[in-house]
A protein has these predicted regions:
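Conserved helicase motor core of SF1/SF2 NTP-dependent helicases
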Residues: 1-192
Length: 192
């Protein structure tokens, strides 16, 4: 923000979801923005969720602890949480669930790039079609997408599967929240 203030000495609109901060604790940037921009900052809170079904939004709200979030009353399937004995077993179930609904956009979201590449290799070995999104990807395609939770920020998918192999990761809670908020219609929280 300091660099932006120096490069662009103008009025700015900064939008974001404080629950999606990429560190171990949620930070409200409006607390330190006045110091950076050396002026008064006007804060508007938008608390209505339009993206997800009620079931997914309630799940995300429980993860974040943000009880002020107002939900759009569009109901869908409940969130499915499953633990698997192996990565392969997890992906077996993901592929079954993907083929049941035939959504246009489906994502398998992982904690790390290494995990995403592992998922890609397993899918490739099984002859599955998928798209991998990394830092250099410039286009979004329909179908099955594999990427990390942090590269999925700003994207939305009809159906989302988390493939979390490391629950002890300090970013687990943020990863779970960000992944949940990417899902429009169905969310499967899968881990080993």
């Amino acid at each position: 923000y300091s660099i932006l203030a120096m490069l662009f000495p103008c009025r700015m609109t900064i939008l974001g979801d404080r629950m999606q901060t990429m560190d171990e604790k949620q930070q409200d940037v409006t607390r330190f923005l006045p110091k950076i921009f050396d002026r008064k900052v006007r804060k508007l809170e938008m608390n209505k969720s339009y993206r997800n079904t009620v079931e997914i939004a309630e799940y995300a709200r429980a993860l974040s602890g943000d009880q002020e979030l107002e939900l759009l009353m569009r109901h869908g399937k409940g969130v499915t949480e499953q633990t698997f004995v192996s990565k392969e077993a997890l992906l077996d179930q993901v592929l079954i669930d993907v083929n049941l609904e035939k959504y246009e956009t489906v994502a398998i979201l992982t904690l790390t790039e290494e995990d995403a590449l592992t998922v890609c290799q397993i899918l490739k070995d099984r002859g599955e079609n998928y798209h991998y999104i990394d830092r250099n990807t410039s286009a979004f395609e329909k179908g099955l997408t594999v990427t990390t939770f942090y590269l999925a920020k700003g994207l939305e998918f009809d159906q989302v599967f988390t493939a979390f192999f490391h629950r002890d990761n300090p970013l687990y809670k943020q990863a779970a929240y960000i992944s949940a908020t990417r899902a429009l219609h169905e969310l499967f929280v899968c881990q080993t």
